[in-house]
Amino acid sequence: MTSRLQVIQGDITQLSVDAIVNAANASLMGGGGVDGAIHRAAGPALLDACKLIRQQQGECQTGHAVITPAGKLSAKAVIHTVGPVWRGGEHQEAELLEEAYRNCLLLAEANHFRSIAFPAISTGVYGYPRAQAAEVAVRTVSDFITRYALPEQVYFVCYDEETARLYARLLTQQGDDPA
């Protein structure tokens, strides 16, 4: 049986999956890093969908997740989540990051998505240490998929080789084959 968890090094905007996760900011209006890359690749329809969500419910709070159509992306949808800003680890950062991953997975499950791709949430300008963030991500996703049938496939999409090796090592340590 192949693992439901896989590590990919590359550009998350190029994946043909049911849902791509966007490491968004609270405004949902795009920004730097993966957030900006997803908005640019998806085109103006994504920004319009995000504006509509803001009009309906305001900003997206840390740990929460919302879903939009994917615009020009190959994915069916984009799930936007706001990860925590790293403030030394004493301000519930791990719990909030766990909540962000779990809420994305719950949206994927509720929408009957078979596949989802995650970036390394909060590790860019939000400053979350990569190794600690990866541990939270792998633990949270692994726990979720033992309880739910969907999504069937979860991808950790890493921009660089070092981060990809980190995720692969964590998956191997827990008995998964990340390839």
Swiss-Prot record:
It comes from the Bacteria. The active site is at D35 (proton acceptor). CDD domains: Macro_OAADPr_deacetylase. InterPro entries: Macro_dom (IPR002589), Macro_dom-like (IPR043472), O-Ac-ADP-ribose_deAcase (IPR024900). GO terms for biological process: purine nucleoside metabolic process. Its EC number is 3.1.1.106. One of its GO terms (molecular function) is O-acetyl-ADP-ribose deacetylase activity. Keywords: Hydrolase. Residues 1-175 form the Macro domain. It catalyses: 3''-O-acetyl-ADP-D-ribose + H2O = ADP-D-ribose + acetate + H(+); 2''-O-acetyl-ADP-D-ribose + H2O = ADP-D-ribose + acetate + H(+). It is an enzyme of class 3 (hydrolase). Substrate binds at D11, I12, N25, G33, V34, D35, S122, T123, G124, V125, Y126. Belongs to the MacroD-type family. YmdB subfamily. Homodimer. Interacts with RNase III. Deacetylates O-acetyl-ADP ribose to yield ADP-ribose and free acetate. Down-regulates ribonuclease 3 (RNase III) activity. Acts by interacting directly with the region of the ribonuclease that is required for dimerization/activation. This is O-acetyl-ADP-ribose deacetylase.
